[in-house]
Amino acid sequence: MTEDFTPNAGYIEVKPPARPRQNIAKDNQQMRLALLRVKRYETAVQRLQEEQDRERQTARQAGRDLIKYTTSVKDHAVPELWGYLPPEKNPYALYEEENKTTGCCVIS
């Protein structure tokens, strides 16, 4: 009975085609490059989707917000518009009074 399954009993032995190692390595390299390319495309699509989902503001609304901010927030760096700070509220004036020197320094 074991003789029936031998190749000389009418069965044809089929072997896979022999592929050289170079072809296998080349195919593997091409597969890796294709996977890297797909990964780059996926990350680019994800970044574009995030950018598209970001909330947008029109130029008109941005201008209105800027005007509203500049007219409502006091900026004492422009004293012609908002006036000078009283000395007790000016932290830089207090700092200058504490650190008054005669103009000489000693380096040791």
UniProtKB/Swiss-Prot annotation:
Propeptide: 106-108
GO MF entry, a single one: G-protein beta-subunit binding
Entry keywords, A to Z: Lipoprotein, Membrane, Methylation, Palmitate, Prenylation, Transducer
Modified residues (Cysteine methyl ester): C105
One Pfam family matching this protein: G-gamma
GO cellular component: heterotrimeric G-protein complex
GO biological process: G protein-coupled receptor signaling pathway; pheromone-dependent signal transduction involved in conjugation with cellular fusion
Topology within the bilayer: Peripheral membrane protein
Gene3D superfamilies in the record: Transducin (heterotrimeric G protein), gamma chain (4.10.260.10)
Family statement: Belongs to the G protein gamma family.
PANTHER family linked: GUANINE NUCLEOTIDE-BINDING PROTEIN SUBUNIT GAMMA
Protein name from the UniProt record: Guanine nucleotide-binding protein subunit gamma
Organism encoding this protein: Yarrowia lipolytica (strain CLIB 122 / E 150) (Yeast)
Taxonomy of the source species: Eukaryota, Fungi, Dikarya, Ascomycota, Saccharomycotina
